[in-house]
């Protein structure tokens, strides 16, 4: 049986909401899996008076980094200051009942669950958010029902959704603009407290939610479900994947009306449509992109139950052709995962390994897939991993693609291979906190005392210039005696945000 939107929130207690958003939602999944906020969560939860109140009330800057998307365009992600983010998650946890009431009020009229990606419990995980999580037993698929009797489909999305949202729009959505404006000076009401906490994770700015931390997804849903309520009340039949809308209508004129209504609802929260991605398409349309069927129905050449060299070559050639035609690296992603499930001959494995390594240098979006879907199934040797890590690192430093550089160092740490191209100067001359951190971790692992000292000296300079913007590197590299305020308290307690690789 499918669940209603409010049912998902009802299954999450206040404590689990706090833990899920902070301990398992502070660091985005786009990062190499070496980060943890669990130690800090347990420390702060067990000793809530550990930090002076004056330190807890301050706004803080964030660490920014770019991650490549399947369209070969980078997206800007963020890592928040731990105290500011903890306090935001605590606020959301404290007011879980009010949030539950809000979501119930905004979604009660829905005949199906409009929002498809949201905070929820997940099987075998304490995290409360995942872009790709789906449970067919309780999520259902409303699209076939929505299509019946309709002739057109509208696709639209919000222009720079998270970056365009205002923290002040949270009270607007929660209690209405009139009440919010009448009480905007009252710092004691919970919705204004939430506004303030949301500002403090972004250096006191009112404009934009951080991309990456899971709390941002809950904040955005506060606003987006309020917009949903107006659209559902107007009897529009649609679904929403965060900021992507798909609406089913009987005529082209109705499609235009939907866009007018959507534009009007978004405007109330100072949001706008991305006109480049707005489309009105005649029905019927395929349920999935055509390239998926092409890949899944392709007859792979086998010998004695194993896919041959020729079979893998033909399959990857086809996948590359589809990727170039559709300009979407996700197609190679899909093909890699399809092949990983198959039994290949040794020659086929070797070809697959070398081709994927070749493609990962050209398309950085594929790099995070390498450990699970390439190195492991195709038995990459230390020599293979060292070679590709060296190529990735040199290319990345030259092009300032620091995501590729940190993954190259991560591979060297995980698989215990040397990376001679890594120098302290690479990190010091960059503006990337994460590159500085990973270079520090590399020298710490290899025991390069001289380079470690260079990095420590650099960290001390950054501590005086822009601690918040580089806090992860500065905190992890400097000893307790060179830290001050909350950082010294955390270091004394033995807290680290890095797990053993």
Which residues does each predicted region cover?
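Conserved two-metal-ion catalytic palm core of "right-hand" nucleic acid polymerases
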Residues: 1-188, 193-211
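General structural signal for secondary-structure boundaries
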Residues: 2-8, 12-14, 81, 166, ...
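Intrinsically disordered, low-complexity segments enriched in polar/charged residues with Gly/Pro
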Residues: 64, 140, 224-225, 266
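Short, surface-exposed helix-loop/turn micro-motifs enriched in polar/charged residues
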Residues: 76, 80, 237-238, 272
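Hydrophobic, Leu/Ile/Phe/Ala-enriched alpha-helical segments that form helix-helix packing faces
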Residues: 88-99, 173-174, 227-231, 262-266, ...
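Generic alpha-helical propensity signal that fires on short helical segments
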Residues: 106, 171-180, 227, 263-265, ...
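Conserved polymerase palm-domain catalytic core
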Residues: 144-241, 247-259, 304-501
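Polymerase palm active-site segment centered on the conserved acidic dipeptide of motif C
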Residues: 252-310, 314, 318
